[in-house]
């Protein structure tokens, strides 16, 4: 059986990236909550 994690940077950015979050009201709420909580990163790292 194929494993569930098939890394793909473009896919990761498109689904969890900053611009993807800003695009929807729910995503903006996510960023707002993470800012309030004081997270170092608002979105997962895509580029290293």
UniProtKB/Swiss-Prot annotation:
PROSITE patterns found in the cross-reference section: RIBOSOMAL_L34
Region (Disordered): 26-48
Signal peptide extent: none
UniProt name for this protein: Large ribosomal subunit protein bL34
PANTHER family in the record: LARGE RIBOSOMAL SUBUNIT PROTEIN BL34M, MITOCHONDRIAL RIBOSOMAL PROTEIN 34 FAMILY MEMBER
Entry's Gene Ontology molecular function annotations: structural constituent of ribosome
Biased composition (Basic residues): 29-48
Domain of life, source organism: Bacteria
Keyword match Ion transport: no
Gene that specifies this protein: rpmH
Any matching Pfam family: Ribosomal_L34
């Amino acid at each position: 059986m194929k494993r569930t994690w098939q890394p793909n940077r473009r896919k990761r950015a498109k689904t969890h990236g900053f611009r993807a979050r800003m695009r929807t009201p729910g995503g903006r709420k996510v960023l707002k909550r993470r800012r309030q909580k004081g997270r170092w990163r608002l979105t997962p790292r895509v580029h290293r």
